[in-house]
Amino acid sequence: MRIRILVPLLLIALGATAQGKKTVFSTMETNHIRVATPGLFSQRELIELPLEDIPDTEYSFPLPGGKVISPYGRGRGRHSGIDIKTYAKDTIRSAFNGVVRMSKPYSAYGNVVVVRHDFGLETIYSHNFKNLVHCGDTVKAGQPIALTGRTGRASTEHLHFETRVNGQHFDPNIIFNMKEQTLNRQR
């Protein structure tokens, strides 16, 4: 199944291609979570994520065995991701192959890792006790990238997990079946 996501194009300039991954990021990209990448989609406002083409070996649930305790979009404010509960210092894994765009403390996110994947998809992992990767590192699906914690604005150990395209967050449930901890290939 192909997931279609409307992507607002903000600027036209040079940037990563939809298929290619940059290994050198701008200062803006390494310092901010919400960053639109100009030219990422070559004038298209719609991208497709071919979930059916992703082999199981190129996907990993970011926190195997964890339980969603706060869904996307609900709560006192607009929740830009989901919260997955586990025990302290549990291993967080990269959901897909990609390149680390950001790895540092960042405001309410606490210690955060942002990984850019094919098709312009980015996954965000925050409130980490410790980040295990650095900006520019290439990561594989399932590779440990951080340990769960409660840094930033967090009241308990958990993973705050987001999916973004061109700086815009969207519901991770579009791509992931949180209950089964698999890709949502049958949506």
Question: Which positions does each model-derived feature cover?
Answer:
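Short, acidic/hydrophobic/Gly-rich beta-strand patch recurrent on exposed beta strands
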Residues: 82-85, 112-117, 162
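Short, well-structured beta-strand-loop connectors
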Residues: 91-102, 133-148
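Zn2+-dependent peptidoglycan hydrolase active-site motif and core
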Residues: 94-132
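A structural micro-motif recognizing beta-strand termini
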Residues: 58, 71, 85-89, 116-118, ...
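Conserved, short, structured surface segments that act as functional micro-motifs
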Residues: 117, 137-187
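A residue-level detector for short acidic-glycine micro-motifs
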Residues: 70, 86, 102, 127-130, ...
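Short glycine/threonine/proline-enriched tight-turn/helix- or strand-capping micro-motif at secondary-structure
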Residues: 48-54, 65-94
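Polar/charged, compositionally biased leader and regulatory segments
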Residues: 2-8, 14-71, 184-187
